[in-house]
């Protein structure tokens, strides 16, 4: 759809991959750019604004686990610019011992954010259609024995995104939904990784996974910005070791109608 002239909302835009993507987005002549994050980083917001002074950058303190915070943040966007054209759901954590928090941020929060945005973007209601990109992971496509809870949350993102990208919904609302799956990337998610595994037994296989080849957040962020510019409804995109590719999931079952 292209980003030029669009109003963009980025949830979790001050994280490593998110921030690198935000820097790329600011070169695309977007109309306005809203960054939702739980922690404010005034220096990063100022740096984003400096990339393109013509694009107004807004920061909103945002708690993705709180429905009131979600509703308030989106209402503020509509009050300021009337329309949302692009939503990026990029908030995420890796901490398997805290099952509830992992699910609340990685999956439930993402679902609630999406469901809040859809009526505002729906061309038959208050919006003019647009694009939602949900950030999952390659561990939403393949199992991750050392991080089973994180993996489950990302599989949930994948299932949710694929379901709401059904052409039936797209044709009604004009909202395309795509999924972006980073491979292993050098971010703070890897910090103190031994404390984040599912079981104490997970350390051996977890440390082995943690020592595999990674990519820089700059490369992953650039890929995400590219997807935002070119994504197709239902598209699933992997950013891994500096390469961006589109994947077609295997179909294991289809309903047989009477």
UniProtKB/Swiss-Prot annotation:
GO terms for molecular function: alcohol dehydrogenase (NAD+) activity. Keywords: NAD, Oxidoreductase. It is an enzyme of class 1 (oxidoreductase). InterPro entries: ADH_Ceratitis-type, NAD(P)-bd_dom_sf, Sc_DH/Rdtase_CS, SDR_fam. It catalyses: a primary alcohol + NAD(+) = an aldehyde + NADH + H(+); a secondary alcohol + NAD(+) = a ketone + NADH + H(+). The keyword Oxidoreductase applies. One of its GO terms (cellular component) is cytoplasm. Its EC number is 1.1.1.1. NAD(+) binds at residues 9-33. Substrate binds at residue 137. Pfam families: adh_short. The active site is at 150 (proton acceptor). SUPFAM superfamilies: NAD(P)-binding Rossmann-fold domains. Homodimer. Belongs to the short-chain dehydrogenases/reductases (SDR) family. PANTHER family: 15-HYDROXYPROSTAGLANDIN DEHYDROGENASE [NAD(+)], ALCOHOL DEHYDROGENASE-RELATED. This is Alcohol dehydrogenase.
